[in-house]
Amino acid sequence: MFRTILYHTMLVGTFLYGMIFRYPALWFMGGERRYNYTSKIAKRWGKNMVWASGSKVEVVYNDSYAEIENIKEDNEAVILISNHQSNIDIPVLIGYFPLFFSFVAKKEMATWPLIGRWMRSFDCIFLDRKNPRQGMKDMKQAIEKIKKGHSYVIFPEGSRTPDGSVQEFKKGSFKLATDTGAKIVPVTLIGTYDVQSRKS
């Protein structure tokens, strides 16, 4: 119970703190400077949220650490394809994966109080799943951002798993990679469902 209260208090508190003390600085920034500034803040936020949950993260590379280092040095845009077990997947990925990246998310999240505003400043892409025409425009925007060198996380299951198992991948999940030629980096999250399942 204590950890749950601490986690949600920090979640709201850090967003409020960011809006008051960090977000105004973005008014004087643009382009890559804005993106890098927000990404650095997000990395600290991710680790703080994992700490608040009482969890520990171990990053295991499957013979790909050198490749990740090369991606960092070359500032290469990649598409991270990850399973989606829990809301805590977001801070885990942001805090512990050694790259700057944003997320491909559903359109509705752009209007969420506090979180939506930070996601927009974080250069997230919002896809309209219900409007195919708008969805195509969103995809074109995403392609341009990837060509600029920005990496993105995609949850190909479309939403969090209801039972901890990997769900069927949605059609079009790999379209960004195929249309841009960006390298795909697979990521497997293990144990986050036990920390915070969809039902909790």
Regions found by a protein language model. Give the residues of each.
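Conserved H-X4-D acyltransferase segment
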Residues: 6-10, 42-105
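Short glycine-rich anion-binding loops that position phosphate/pyrophosphate groups of nucleotides
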Residues: 84-86, 157-161
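Membrane-embedded segments
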Residues: 74-76, 85-137, 141
